[in-house]
């Protein structure tokens, strides 16, 4: 049977970490340093709540001020120095009951691991725009790589505010004749060099402080209504496609597909060793809906999850600390 080039059927990681914020990256430092083959899958360079924080001054051992993105880069370099592998890719599905466990990304890749640490944060949207669900698959999309080619030489809107949204918009701009990049806030949360490159694309128009109100059409999308927060007026963009890449505060756990125990608010339930209801699957960070949302707290949970993974993989009777 032919095997897709996007798969690596013979490569099995000891641990796959989903998310590269402080919890996921700290976990990677510990598992890689312990000698376990470690893969970290992350959605964007400025991943998670820390990645878009403008100034950090209270992270122990790191004199500030520095941006959350800069702090993440320091942590990732430390994890890489121990052998952790970082791969950019948005996780859309998992099979946690297979052996080994499987993780799938939006671009069609499959990764396999003996254990999983879910550290994907809490930045999903809880509420959808009017018309979003109605036109899903008929002009509304959450994947530029998947659907951009359907809008060749057509105008589209891309809704987002970070470097992940920019990356998707840049790909979409290869096909669409016009890309309106709609940002609800007053700024884009991405490294300056990324924004500068994006602004130079000839068929891209950035609309700051424009809040989406409604996606309109008949059988397919015909446009999107926006509220110009600067001029305090509504406008209609005539577009044939709307790509949505916005975040929120809801735990990012859709890819788990209900395979682990969660609360009504989609918070993952773990035991004292950070293990979920599925053996070999652990969780750390904001996916647990902690009352205190601080980078150092998330990092501590990532450490604890990593030590529990070490215990699980090695068959030890108790968690052994690292120094």
Swiss-Prot record:
Pfam families: Pyr_redox_2 (PF07992). PROSITE patterns: PYRIDINE_REDOX_2. It is an enzyme of class 1 (oxidoreductase). It is found in: Cytoplasm. Its cofactor is FAD. Its main location: cytoplasm. This is Thioredoxin reductase. It comes from Aquifex aeolicus (strain VF5).
